[in-house]
């Protein structure tokens, strides 16, 4: 295994964003998928505006594209596992029908991700009992994912109860590695902890999905000082694609290859498409990948 086992995708949030549906609302599915082909990527993740499987599969087949996965907002602590299991089963059924590989889960109980409050200082924290509930619930959801031929990959995320490296450690320690895997996101790790290698190096054996998200240092520091919310921060440009920010992806990529990572690396950068043209930034990312990561000379 190695470089040839890595699939390169790009997420739809550069074109349209589920956190703010009004952003990029004029960008159609056909436009998005065609841009992805032009930029040289092999697939994408499912956005909130994507259609039912038969319609989506036709559009994918026309462009020889694949689906990597789709986000699922879990509320295991808030609503209990039985309700979540029912919703997650429907989620996995959809993913199976579109040929996905992973089910991306983020626990949204107490999340400030969608609220207009300081995402840098007001993140939630779980009690010991809540941690136990979450970990047991994720094991249950992971078993369901497996029944549909999917890996459950948990997404550590700004503004949630599983954001920091320490919290990722606790989640990994408390869940069964047979059922719960990790989505490793460079941008969320960096903005949370100022470090994106610790999680990667410590939990490489649990990683089944990867997001390459870059960050703009100056904007990050300004947003932190001004106490911006998650949505305010990405509208101001805190995130960008690899090659346009301050993260060194060469070290990350070499680590993944050295450990025989096999699966998707998905470029992800929440930006306002009216400010950051999605195709232009997809091409910036592709150029960086080809010249800095895949070039045999490097």
Swiss-Prot record:
Per its record, the protein catalyses: scyllo-inosose = 3D-3,5/4-trihydroxycyclohexane-1,2-dione + H2O
Query: Record keywords: Nucleus included?
Result: no
What GO molecular function annotations does the UniProt record carry, in alphabetical order? manganese ion binding; myo-inosose-2 dehydratase activity
Q: Which Pfam families match?
A: AP_endonuc_2 (PF01261)
* Cofactor needs: glutathione; Co(2+); Mn(2+)
What EC number(s) is this enzyme filed under? 4.2.1.44
Identify the metabolic or biological route this protein is part of: Polyol metabolism; myo-inositol degradation into acetyl-CoA; acetyl-CoA from myo-inositol: step 2/7
Gene Ontology terms describing biological process: inositol catabolic process
Keywords per UniProt: Cobalt, Lyase, Manganese
| Taxonomy, superkingdom | Bacteria
Q: Does the keyword Lyase apply?
A: yes
InterPro entries on file: IolE (IPR023952), IolE/MocC (IPR030823), IolE/XylAMocC-like (IPR050312), Xyl_isomerase-like_sf (IPR036237), Xyl_isomerase-like_TIM-brl (IPR013022)
UniProt similarity note: Belongs to the IolE/MocC family.
Question: What name is this protein filed under?
Answer: Inosose dehydratase
Gene from which this protein is expressed: iolE
């Amino acid at each position: 295994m190695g470089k040839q086992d890595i699939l390169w995708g790009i997420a739809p949030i550069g074109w349209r964003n589920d956190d703010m549906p009004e952003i990029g609302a004029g960008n159609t599915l056909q436009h998005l998928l065609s841009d992805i082909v032009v930029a040289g990527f092999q697939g994408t993740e499912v956005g909130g505006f994507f259609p039912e499987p038969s319609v989506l599969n036709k559009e994918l087949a026309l462009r020889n594209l694949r689906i990597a996965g789709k986000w699922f907002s879990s509320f295991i602590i808030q609503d209990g596992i039985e309700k979540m299991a029912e919703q997650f089963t429907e989620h996995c059924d959809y993913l199976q029908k579109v040929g996905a590989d992973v089910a991306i889960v983020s626990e949204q109980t107490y999340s400030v991700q969608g609220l207009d409050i300081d995402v840098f200082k007001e993140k939630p924290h779980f009690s010991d009992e809540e941690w136990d509930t979450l970990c047991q619930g994720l094991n249950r959801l992971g078993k369901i994912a497996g029944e549909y031929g999917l890996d459950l990959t948990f997404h550590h995320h700004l503004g949630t109860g599983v954001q920091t490296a320490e919290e990722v450690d606790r989640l990994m320690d408390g869940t069964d590695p047979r059922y719960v895997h990790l989505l490793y996101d460079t941008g969320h790790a960096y903005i949370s902890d100022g470090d994106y290698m610790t999680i990667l190096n410590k939990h490489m054996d649990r990683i089944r999905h990867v997001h390459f998200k870059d960050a703009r240092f100056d904007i990050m520091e300004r947003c932190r000082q001004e106490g911006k919310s998650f949505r305010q921060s990405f509208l101001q440009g805190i995130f960008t694609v690899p090659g346009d920010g301050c993260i060194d992806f060469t070290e990350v990529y070499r680590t993944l290859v050295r450990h025989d990572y096999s699966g998707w690396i998905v470029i992800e950068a929440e930006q306002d498409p009216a400010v950051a043209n999605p195709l232009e930034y997809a091409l910036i990312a592709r150029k960086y990948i080809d010249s800095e990561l895949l070039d045999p000379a490097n």
